[in-house]
Amino acid sequence: MITRLLKSVREYKKPSILAPVLVSCEVVMEVLMPLLMSKLIDKGIEKGDMNYVWWMGTLLLVCMFISMAFGALSGREAAKASAGFAKNLRHDMFHNLQTFSFSNIDKFKTSSIITRLTTDVTNVQNAYQMVIRIAVRAPIMLIFARCASFYLNAKVALILLGIAPVLLLGLIIVFRYAHPIFVRMFKKFDVMNNVVQENVRGIRVVKSFVREEHEIGKFTEVNNSIRNDAVKAERAINFNGPLMMASVYTAMLLISWVGAKLVVNNEMTTGQLTSMFSYTMQILMSLMMVSMIIVMLVISKTSAERISELLDETPDITNPENPVMEVKDGSIDFDHVYFSYSKNKEKSCLMDFDIHINSGETIGIIGGTGSGKSSFVQLIPRLYDATDGDIKVGGVDVRNYDLDVIRDNVAMVLQKNVLFSGTIKENLRWGNPNATDEEMIEACKIAQADSFISAFPDGYDTYIEQGGTNVSGGQKQRLCIARALLKNPKILILDDSTSAVDTATDAQIQKGFAEYIPGTTKLIIAQRISSVENADRIIVIDNGKINAIGTHDELLKDNEIYKEVYESQKKGGEE
């Protein structure tokens, strides 16, 4: 895990190395100063040698300023390294996220991904900065200060040696108790983020159903749960503070008592005792730093594991070794295809799909909710891979195509229409970044979007709010259809993408398809018979199987499911 994360350091290796080197130099200066202070007291002050006092005092000041300079430089380099590391980590996570297939994305909640990219990265960044500074500073200071204390007086130094195991035991207890709590707490952060995200996204529904109190209750429940875990974790961590302070005061009292006896017996000088107090503080401070590092690592370990999960997730769908780079035409072949989201053929949502669709053919798809219509069309651009059987586009197995090539030649307008923050032009150019204004207008005319766009004060430069909240559902659908048309695809798939437009507009869109893109294979999933009745053929899907294929007239005559849907809609229209 650590090796995987450190790959994100990359161009920030230099500051990552410089920071600990500069910290080491800072520590050397800090450890040297108590020794100089000891000499200043014993040889200067006690003997009344003011020249020695001035000389040694100046040397102490020089050491202090050098130490400060090293400290400032190490802080700057550590900040540069940790911020760069976090930037690369976010980039690597987001880049890997873009390679995910739908099945990979299904493993993570949106709120969890956001938490990993923000909170978790910040935790790891703080830990990294602490490691390249404090984790270097603490052991070096501990070793140097301990060696210097033994050099001054071994008897007093042994007191400090006995305190370390007590502190180490405390740190182990804290780590073992706190880590599982932090793991649980970060999972609850995902739940809380999910509650907030759902509430913000569905705020209009919440308001219309007067469910504010219910939503507040959901948020309060998870918020209180996080608070309870945080209290438990802090309780464990706070145990470390009193233990540290008790150790510090115990050490100081013992050193004062033993040191005073040694000074009285002329076994130790006043300057050495003063320096010993300084080294005691340095040793105990370094142990406190180790304690801080342990606490930070407890928090960041959980975050690091969650980040690694996202970084180590490999896409289920990848390019073949020698991919086909051209789609010849829009013909589609399903050869006894089975598909299951769980990769278990026994739980297939598509079973024994066998069909040939000619290039340029218009295919209507009818079926009940959950019958497998969307699953069927999502296999064509290889958003998922079939569990069994073969799927061909243009006579070539879709698994042999370059992913970008097959998806560029298959335009999908999904059930959930998504518009991004930006102008209408910017949203349309998702279909073709190089599209001219004339091409955009033509696509919008086919999609019956040009009329309402032209009615906006800013026309095609109208700004679309996040999620397309300032356009209606029908307008959003037509913009998404126009965006798909700009790809100039060989296959166009509409997944119930005209459900929010009236039947007259729907008919105009179908007429535009027939007139302007006759060579494009068109697959139209619809709930309304009127949307597909003029298709070359209509597929009736029932419980994951092809129930019937035929023209509108043929199905109306021979298929009970189609006839039932038609009669119910006809009756509803008459009423």
What is each residue range found by the language model?
Residues 33, 37, 58, 74, ...:
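Hydrophobic/aromatic residues in alpha-helical transmembrane segments
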Residues 11-14, 78, 99-103, 119-132, ...:
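An intracellular "coupling" helix at the cytosolic face of ABC transporter transmembrane type-1 domains
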Residues 48-53, 144, 148-162, 176, ...:
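Helix-loop-helix
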Residues 11, 15-28, 39, 60-63, ...:
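Transmembrane helices of ABC transporter permease
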Residues 325-575:
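ABC-type nucleotide-binding domain
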Residues 47, 83, 91-115, 119-121, ...:
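Short intracellular "coupling" helices and adjacent cytoplasmic loop segments at the cytosolic face
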Residues 1-33, 37, 45-59, 73-78, ...:
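Membrane-integrated ABC transporters
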Residues 26, 30-34, 62, 67-82, ...:
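Alpha-helical transmembrane segments
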